[in-house]
Amino acid sequence: MNKFKRSSRRRLPPIRSGEIIDYKNTSLLRRFISEQGKILSRRMNKLTSKQQRLVTVAIKRARILALLPFLNNES
């Protein structure tokens, strides 16, 4: 017997097919940043490796242009 059950329900992808991963799209990029301001891992995001690379580059560009903070000090 297998202890772990897989759900038959298919999860929605975190990035829909129409969404473009761009450094100007800060509302999309904020979903992939932790409360401390760190970039979340691929396992937590459920992204493909290509999507994770694009998200990482976009977040880093947005940080340099001051669209996203490097650290989240709102505590």
Swiss-Prot record:
Its main location: plastid. The keyword Glycoprotein does not apply. GO terms for cellular component: chloroplast; mitochondrial small ribosomal subunit. SUPFAM superfamilies: Ribosomal protein S18. Signal peptide: none annotated. The gene is rps18. Part of the 30S ribosomal subunit. PROSITE patterns: RIBOSOMAL_S18. GO terms for molecular function: small ribosomal subunit rRNA binding; structural constituent of ribosome. One of its GO terms (biological process) is translation. It is found in: Plastid, Chloroplast. This is Small ribosomal subunit protein bS18c. Belongs to the bacterial ribosomal protein bS18 family. Keywords: Chloroplast, Plastid, Ribonucleoprotein, Ribosomal protein, RNA-binding, rRNA-binding.
